[in-house]
Amino acid sequence: MSIIAAELSNLDMSYRRVLPLENGSNFRDAGDYPTIDGKRVIRGELFRSAAMYAIESESDIDYLENFKFKTVVDLRSNEERELQPDRWVLKDKSINYIFHDYSIMNLMSSSSEGSSANDEKVDTGNYYQVMHKTLVPQIKLYFDALLNEQVPVILHCSAGQDRTGFISAVLLKLLGVSEDLIYEDYNLSTDLRRPSIEAGDINYFEKAKTNAFAKLMLSYGAGTPAKQGNPLRTSDGVPFLKTALDAIKDDYGSVEKYLKTEIGLSSLDIAQLRARYTY
């Protein structure tokens, strides 16, 4: 075995799903799941995470550099990226850091239907119903990276559960993973999130004066002792993700048709993705 092959083998053995980072939150391999046709989603190339602002220790950065990430797709708004920049990524010029330019206020307004105009929180149930519409630009960025084999890739937002969870689910569904397993993967975020790590050392009370995302975070308890992430389901126990996938089925019939219609993928693109990211 060559030195490079040995290093890759050791790296692969260093984690099962969650990367052992000192200051990571919900940072995990999004692959390595079986598909309904007997294949398996590739491991070691598709990663997902919550905010990576707190990743700055030498040990964390040295570990992550071993993966030789080619792309980071940041799903966050302008305000989120301004408040909590991906510092280690921005310092690594070998990584293609891509994002869509939009305001957190757009996200909040897209979830406000049926809510009070003065409500400063995101209506989670409403937001999941429109994710397949509001996240189209970000989904295009992610799938472009996959089609151009700009991997390993990290897909992330602030908590690594809602926007990231939805787009990861769309990919897994396209690759042939069962919905039951997709929901299991989605629900992992409740236990794998580390809210205190995500919050970092930021003075949210001060930042809220000029940053809408900081103000939003205060409404969720930022600046107070952090709690575990909340379960990602309705009061009836239904995963919020099901609302988003059902919306795709209602509007398009299938994830594949959705990706062709809204994201612009061709049948050849889809075949290429399945061949490249499953085995």
Residue ranges and their predicted role:
Residues 1-154, 167-279:
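Cys-dependent protein tyrosine phosphatase-like superfamily
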Residues 159-164:
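Ser/Thr-glycine-rich phosphate-binding loops at phosphate-binding pockets of nucleotides
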